[in-house]
Design a protein with these regions (language model features):
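Hydrophobic anchor at the beta1->P-loop junction of P-loop NTPases
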Residues: 64
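NTP-dependent small-molecule kinase module
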Residues: 2-52, 214-220, 224, 228-281
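Walker A/P-loop
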Residues: 73
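ATP-binding Walker
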Residues: 70
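Phosphate-binding P-loop
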Residues: 52-59
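ATP-dependent small-molecule kinase phosphotransfer cores
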Residues: 90-160, 171-176, 180-220, 224-225, ...
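P-loop (Walker A) phosphate-binding loop of NTP-binding proteins
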Residues: 67
């Protein structure tokens, strides 16, 4: 059955980004919209922004970001299927970039510390996806760390019909899900029942609790490496453009996935999208 998408909203927060500015310790108040534009013109080409403008379509975009292991990829795929749209992952762009260079993903991740152009190229391709010109389906769901902020940039160029979601859950919940993925269901269930359900001030406190239980020792080390890498990425984007993609002011809908199964989260997401004004008939 063909799905007809009826767009009935133009969110003010998207059409006119809330401020376009965030505080960066080294630079003071930074206009991240201008920061993105300057980076594109420098690394992609002087006409790159004009080319993005000309590629803009009316196709709706659901842009999803969030903490690790919050279920954002699962929900993005489910939404794309539900609305008959395309699923796109920024992580896929990163892997393709590494393959084109003939290097591993880990090697490319290390290059990010010194080569700003890698980030900018991936972000520009993300903006091209948001523009929708090369999209065959009626909408797209784009998942990654920065698509919502790239969506705000595209909104400044005239792109409409964007909704930006952020998925979050506690560090404890993220660690438990990582244990389930890396060490299996048994380790997950032990951790869930015995790791105190409280707000942890830092990763080391959580690591200590897990090490006491003697479950998934190597897995939790990998989890902490991933968490530290995420912090590095946030600092890098702050320095490059002037925004922190963990700043919730850049989103329209915040989803808390703590202690929730994917089906429950999906139902909540659909309700939030409906309340926001997104509807498919």
């Amino acid at each position: 059955m063909e799905i007809l998408l009826q767009v009935i909203w133009t969110p003010p927060s998207v059409a006119k980004p809330k401020t376009g500015k965030y505080y960066h310790s080294a630079l003071g108040v930074v206009d991240y919209i201008s920061g993105i534009e300057a980076a594109f013109r420098k690394y992609i080409g002087e006409n790159s922004v004009d080319e993005l403008k000309s590629a803009i379509t009316k196709k709706p975009m659901i842009l999803i970001a969030g903490d690790q292991l919050t279920g954002k990829s699962t929900q993005a795929k489910s939404l794309a299927e539900h609305f008959g749209g395309a699923f796109r992952s920024v992580g896929m762009l990163f892997r393709e970039a590494a393959a084109n260079r003939g290097i591993t993903v880990a090697e490319q991740a290390r290059l990010l510390l010194t080569e700003r152009g890698i980030d900018v190229d991936i972000d520009y391709k993300t903006c091209q996806m948001i523009a929708g010109n090369e999209l065959q389906s009626n909408l797209a769901v784009i998942e990654g760390r920065q698509p919502a902020y790239m969506g705000s940039f595209m909104a400044s160029l005239g792109k409409k019909h964007i909704v930006r979601l952020y998925f979050q859950c506690s560090i404890r919940e993220q660690a438990l899900r990582f244990l389930r993925r890396e060490s299996g269901e048994a380790a997950y269930q032990v951790g869930k029942s015995q790791i105190p359900n409280k707000k942890y001030g830092n990763l080391e406190d959580l690591r200590t609790e897990i090490q006491i239980l003697d479950i998934g020792g190597e897995a939790i080390d990998k989890f902490m490496e991933n968490q530290n890498r995420d912090e590095d990425d946030r600092h890098r984007y702050s320095g490059l453009y002037g925004f922190d993609y963990g700043n919730l002011d850049g989103y329209d809908i915040i989803m808390d996935t703590n202690n929730k199964e994917p089906v429950e989260v999906f139902e909540e997401v659909l309700k939030e999208l409906e309340s926001f004004g997104f509807r498919a008939d």
